[in-house]
Structures are given as structure tokens and as C-alpha cells.
């Protein structure tokens, strides 16, 4: 294993810009690690070695010529979740229905990464169309957690998190619909951030649930995550839900936080997310120790009541399937991707039905059916409409909380990583794993998972979730970096 792959992204960027090492050398080191280890983890669906090295060489030429580099992360390679379109690699979303499909255009996030001089190593594995909490729903096989290959890395973005934990990439991009960045980060001892909804473009992000989906940065340190956040955030006229607002200076916040002083910062512990049935003792012990550490850094910690959080799970699992049933209607075999039964003996309607039956996995079909039912004429008011009202109440709970505190904290997940296959046949148990993360998606607010150590129960990673109001993403980074610095180095998976 090359020593280069153990370095954080900020250090690699400094070494590249100072000519101590070339971007091509760094990129090749990570490609070698992928080749050597991905048979064990299956973090990647596609590896773009040729394209990544070409991008790295472009940065190296700029460094050699003394040119201004396009971003602070120029030359540092990255793993991209396979839900963002790319013109030079397939985009499958972990689904058979898009097997082999290559987009004619880049997602805005992809384009920003290219413009920043960041080589894209490849596309990472995920639950099909981002529906799942374990990356077991991928049509191309599950991703395994580098901490224990008999356990899941979380989902839906388990591939990106596993790639970071296995030193296959120093940076990654994920998406977060109900916790799909934060939850895998917690299970792999990496850092993941769900930015404020609308602050990272969704153009070219294949939609799961349009009012919930949000792309975001992942890395092994808070500062690296902030540097990547700054690259991908910003208004995009191609995205109708994009927010026209300045991007908070998350990098400055991370650097300030690393000083370790949280004097005057008001932190609320969410009453509904700190205990209860289903919480693992080791997770709660790690969380309580993290809260004590935040207090020791000077923060004012109080308990905050968010009563409607108790209804977030049923509301989420009505709203999300409803949007899924609409968004996935376009995958019908008529335009692109898989086409089944096209032998001249079936009508167009039959081809559509056969294509969807063959192309979608069980979880996707389940959510389409739930969504179609919730949106049907007789049940729209009873289910979907009621869920949207609960969503408003959850947002009001958070707004009220932020009148009293600057950030909220909770465990990122109720337990550590569960075993492969443990929850596959129990959808409700799988859905409950999102309990801590999904309220923020319903409200459109921002959140971070930062490693808080290993559980005493099983020696597996635990994540501390930090939450902040919309457009206050910088608060996450200040508190997260302060906690990270005080916590000190952690063991790694490898």
C-alpha cells in the first residue's frame, strides 16, 4: 500500500501544488489500491482509469508551467456516486434498467469537479436509485464494509463511504435523500455532509425523490469535506430548485473550528433522538461521551424537544415513495436503457410492463407501489396530504429549536453496521435505520456525520450527527472540526 493514499486531501493538494508529488502519481496510487482491494469491497461499479490519469496530467502540466490552479483540490482524485451523469462513464444508478447507459451530458456536479481539476476515479456502488440503507439493493451486488466485510457500509451511498474507508479515494461525492450520505459515513468512520437543500445542483442527478434529494461531499476529515463542499455548492440556473444565496464559507469555519474553542456556541441535544427502543448501548455511550467533549470545549449544551420527530418516519415513507412513483415512470424502455419483450409480439404497453418488471429490483417495485397507492384518488388526502402536513410541523419544530440553539446533535444511526442479509427481508427494520437522519431531509436543513469513535459493544464505528438551519452549513463545519480536533486520531479500517 502506497503511503500517499493514507494522506488527507488537503495534504495531497499541497504536495501536488508544490511539485513534491504529481497528480498522476497520486491518482495512480489510488487506482492501484482500487485494483488491489475492490474485489473484497465492491465499492466501484465503473473505474475510469484512463480519464482520471488524463485529468491528472492536465493538472501536472499546469503546475509545471506555474499556472494558477483551478481550485484548492486540483489534482486530488475523487470517487463519484453512480447517480450523477457522466459522458465518459456509464450511469446505472445501481439498476439493471440503466445497465450500460452513458449520458449525453454531465451533471452540474460532475462539470464542477472537472472544472476544479479533480480527477474522477470512477463511479461508486449504491442501492438501486438510492433506495435503501445498506447498498444491498444494488443490481450489481452489495458493497462490503471495510471495517468488517460481513457487514454493510450503509446506504444508499455505501460505495462512496467504503471507498474512503478502504483508502481507494481521498474524496467522494454522495447524495442524501433520507440519510444516504450521513448514515454510511457513520458506519465507516468517515465524514459526510448533507448540504442545505437547493445549495448543490441536482441537474444531472437522477432523481429518487425530488424534494428530498441533495448531493453532498464525503471525505476522511472535516476540512477535506469543507474543501469539496466549496467546489460543488452554488446556484445553478439549470436546476429549478437551486437556491440563489451565497455559499457559506465552510472552509473558514472548519479552520476556525479546528482551534477547538466552542465558547458561546449553543448546542441542543434532540430529546427524541437520544434514547429509546432500538438504540444500541455502545452508540449511546459514544454519543454521550461526544456531548461531554463538546461541553468541555466551551459549548452550552441543553436538551431540545422536537415532538413531531416521532412522526417523521411514516411521513417520510409516504412522501418519498409518492415522488418515486412519479420520477421512475420515465423508465419504460421506450427512450433509453433496458428494453424487454421487444420481439415484435408485444404491444408498447406490454413492452413497458416487461421492461419495468425485469429492470427494477424488489425494493424499487415496493416503493413504486406504495407511492402509487398513496397518490391514488381515494387515498391522496388520507396519506400523502397528511404526510406533507407532518413535514411542515417537523420544519416548525426545527425552526423553534434554532431560536434557542445554534446547532442540534444526535447519534447519526441507532446502531453500528448490521450484518449483510440481516434486514433484507424486513423492510420496516431497514426503514427504522434512517430514524435519526431523515427529519433534516423533510425540512431541507443541513447535517453532518463525524466519527465519534468505536462502539464498546462491537468495536465498530459510530457517528455523531450535527444539524444546523438552512443556509447555515458553516456551523456544521465549525462544530465538527472542533470536535474532531478534540477527539484526536481514530483507528482506520485498514
From Swiss-Prot:
GO CC, any one term: glutamyl-tRNA(Gln) amidotransferase complex
GO biological process annotation, one example: translation
Any GO molecular function: ATP binding
Keyword Secreted: no
Catalytic activity: L-glutamyl-tRNA(Gln) + L-glutamine + ATP + H2O = L-glutaminyl-tRNA(Gln) + L-glutamate + ADP + phosphate + H(+)
Active site: 81 (charge relay system), 156 (charge relay system), 180 (acyl-ester intermediate)
EC code: 6.3.5.7
Record's keyword terms, sorted: ATP-binding, Ligase, Nucleotide-binding, Protein biosynthesis
Domain of life: Bacteria
Entries under SUPFAM superfamilies matching the protein: Amidase signature (AS) enzymes (SSF75304)
Assigned protein family: Belongs to the amidase family. GatA subfamily.
Purpose of the protein: Allows the formation of correctly charged Gln-tRNA(Gln) through the transamidation of misacylated Glu-tRNA(Gln) in organisms which lack glutaminyl-tRNA synthetase. The reaction takes place in the presence of glutamine and ATP through an activated gamma-phospho-Glu-tRNA(Gln).
Subunit composition and interactions: Heterotrimer of A, B and C subunits.
Protein name: Glutamyl-tRNA(Gln) amidotransferase subunit A
Species whose genome carries this gene: Mycolicibacterium gilvum (strain PYR-GCK) (Mycobacterium gilvum (strain PYR-GCK))
